[in-house]
């Protein structure tokens, strides 16, 4: 597969904004679980199904990710540096991916697609982000905004995505960074 062009794109992942400053994890899960179950899901339902709201009012602590994943029947992937083929295979076979990244603080986003001409420099990652961000152009996403009213779809280069993804592993207790359904 290395060196060949491809385009994996889950176009039917609903973009869902996060309702509060600290609910990116729930909104991102609502996108992934909603895709898997073929329904529109409110992030509040994710929170309610994950335990008491007070437990998660300050966000989802990395140590709580496994229990959260189990509650929603999402498979956990151990942190690792993905090759183009590895990320492509995971996305293609499992569906959209809930990802913990550092932007610079911990933040959950959803990978909905990956496309490439077969080279590292021309490989791009499609993102559904529950926070508002200037989408810019492919490989040139703009700054995060001070709002979370709509969420944003944008495209990062593989290198940009890898920097945000791998930087999250430097945070304490980050042992799980990717969650996914087992397809539909």
Residue ranges of model-derived segments:
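Noncatalytic regulatory segments and standalone regulatory/sensor domains
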Residues: 1, 55, 92, 114-184
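Cysteine-nucleophile protease catalytic domains, especially the papain-like/related folds used
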Residues: 2-78, 164-184
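Peptidoglycan cell-wall recognition and remodeling modules
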Residues: 14, 48-57, 97-99, 103-104, ...
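Helix N-cap and loop-to-helix transition residues
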Residues: 41-43, 60-61, 82-83, 119, ...
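Active-site-adjacent substructure of cysteine-protease-like catalytic cores
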Residues: 77-132
């Amino acid at each position: 597969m290395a060196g060949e062009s491809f385009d994996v794109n889950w176009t039917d992942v609903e973009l869902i904004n996060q309702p509060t400053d600290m609910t990116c994890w729930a909104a991102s899960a609502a996108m992934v679980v909603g895709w898997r179950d073929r329904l529109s899901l409110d992030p509040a339902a994710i929170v309610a199904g994950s335990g008491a709201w007070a437990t998660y009012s300050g966000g989802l602590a990395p140590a709580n990710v496994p229990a959260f994943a189990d509650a929603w029947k999402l498979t956990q992937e151990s942190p690792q540096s993905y090759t183009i083929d590895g990320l492509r295979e995971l996305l293609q076979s499992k569906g959209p991916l809930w990802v913990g990244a550092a932007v610079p603080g911990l933040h959950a986003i959803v990978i909905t697609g990956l496309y490439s001409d077969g080279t590292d420099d021309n490989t791009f990652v499609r993102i559904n982000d529950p926070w508002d961000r200037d989408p810019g152009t492919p490989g040139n996403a703009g700054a995060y905004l001070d709002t979370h009213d709509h969420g944003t779809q944008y495209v990062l280069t593989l290198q940009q995505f890898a920097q945000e993804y791998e930087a999250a592993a430097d945070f304490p207790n980050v042992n799980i960074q990717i969650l996914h359904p087992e397809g539909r």
